[in-house]
Regions:
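Hydrophobic/aromatic residues located in beta-strands of well-ordered beta-sheets
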Residues: 4, 127, 182-183, 300, ...
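Charged, often glycine-rich, active-site loop that binds/positions anionic groups
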Residues: 45-73
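Nucleotide-activated donor-dependent transferases that construct or modify glycoconjugates
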Residues: 2-13, 97-98
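Glycine-rich beta-alpha loop elements in corrinoid/cobalamin-binding modules
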Residues: 20, 24-28, 34-46, 68-201
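Short beta-strand/turn micro-motifs composed of small residues
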Residues: 8, 39, 131, 335, ...
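Radical SAM [4Fe-4S] cluster-binding motif and immediate context
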Residues: 209-380
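A short helix->loop->beta-strand "cap" motif at the edges of active sites that frequently abuts
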Residues: 2, 122-126, 148, 327-329, ...
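Conserved beta-strand positions
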Residues: 6, 94, 129, 153, ...
Length: 380
């Protein structure tokens, strides 16, 4: 089967389990491909100490988080080169889209990963990657980062699987490998930009679950939370947001999949039920059960774009499954203020939600609606 090296170019110097790594690794391993990870997070010559900086700024409560960490003093480029020589991957991949798009370095992965790889000897490895920039400005990226062989626009789990399956099939037949007919990819050929037909959106998220969190080392599972150090993972129960705020990177993905129209009264995209997709309650619960009981995960950091717009029936089913279980977890979510009411608070409690993050735009109503495409009930 095909061999692929994931490179995590995270520069934050703290535990993050990037969802794209877990989602892509899971489906590739279940299809018998070999996946390994080179994680640059804890290299002293690469990463910053984000926790120390934010603690000093009073953004985080004081903890002894640093006592749990061991930074690698080796040269990150030397170690990555060694990994490539030892593993000899068919593909190298370092950026992709998931719900984890709004911060924590996801949007700069493509640049940081390329900076790590561009001057190394990749042997015969094929360089391909995805993410927001690959989706919104693929030709610019390919012209600027000219050592990249292929880009994947939009959600890339199934496209990457098709690429590896196709490669493996051709390799087993001793045939020449031609990946240029696969939907969802773009590339430069004879100095001309080629963008293939877009792949379909992943309608059934259960197809790409469960995600592979075993690929991360223990340091990546640790993070500060409310004055304590806990074992945590970044997680998604859904993908997509029903709203189309002009300042949000979510609109890049919406436009890629042709969700171009929105309501002038609410800012919600038309046909949003086809864009906002949820895992089944059973699949979510099974993942949570494994993480809590097998990996001792305490905190589930949900990166769902707007948690309270998720399918309410699925959330109710999940809350019942959690309520009847002996799960010892806390869940942190992000949502919009207008979704908060007595019923939703009761539901969040039953789901073991411990923290809620919300954003509020401090601007007058006219500017917010006309310039930001953000609508909210002033009274609420």
């Amino acid at each position: 089967m095909a061999k692929i090296l994931f490179v995590n170019p995270n520069k934050w110097g703290r535990g993050i389990t990037h969802i794209w790594i877990a989602s892509h690794s899971g489906i590739l391993k279940r299809n018998n491909h070999t996946v390994e990870l080179f994680d640059a997070t804890f290299y002293s010559d690469w990463s910053l100490n984000e926790v120390k900086f934010q603690t000093k700024n009073k953004m985080y409560k004081q903890t002894n988080y640093d006592d749990y960490l061991k930074f690698n003093s080796n040269n990150v480029l030397d170690d990555l080169q060694k990994k490539i020589f030892e593993f000899s991957p068919d593909f190298i991949f370092w950026s992709a889209i998931s719900s984890h798009i709004h911060g924590e370095g996801e949007y700069v992965n493509i640049q940081n990963g390329y900076d790590l790889l561009k001057d190394l000897d990749k042997k015969n490895s094929i360089l391909l990657t995805g993410g927001l920039q690959a989706t919104s400005a693929s030709e610019i990226i390919l012209r600027k980062m000219e050592k990249i062989n292929y880009l994947i626009g939009g959600e890339s789990e199934l496209v990457l699987l098709e690429i590896l399956n196709s490669f493996d099939k051709k390799k087993s037949l001793n045939a020449s490998v031609d990946l240029e007919s696969i939907d969802g990819i773009s590339f430069i050929k004879e100095n001309k930009f080629v963008q293939n037909k877009k792949q379909k959106i992943i309608n059934d998220l259960d197809k790409i679950s469960p995600y592979d969190y075993d690929i991360f080392d223990n340091q990546s599972l640790l993070r500060p939370y409310n004055g304590s150090v806990v074992k945590a993972v970044d997680f998604e129960m859904s993908r997509g947001c029903i709203y189309s705020c002009n300042y949000c990177v979510e609109t890049i993905i919406q436009k890629y999949y042709d969700f171009n129209e929105s309501s002038p009264k609410t800012g919600a995209i038309k046909n949003f039920k086809s864009y906002l997709r949820n895992k089944s309650s059973k699949k979510i619960f099974d993942e949570l059960l494994y993480l809590n009981k097998e990996k001792n995960i305490e905190l589930i950091r949900c990166q769902d774009t707007n948690f309270l717009t998720n399918d309410r029936n699925i959330l109710l089913e999940l809350s019942n499954l959690i309520d009847k279980s002996d799960l010892t977890i806390k869940i942190y979510i992000e949502t919009r203020p207008e979704g908060i009411n007595e019923k939703s608070i009761d539901l969040l409690k039953k789901l073991k939600v411990d923290g809620v993050g919300m954003g509020i735009e401090l601007a007058d109503e006219t500017f917010r609606e006309n310039a930001l495409n953000r609508f909210a009930d002033q009274e609420k």
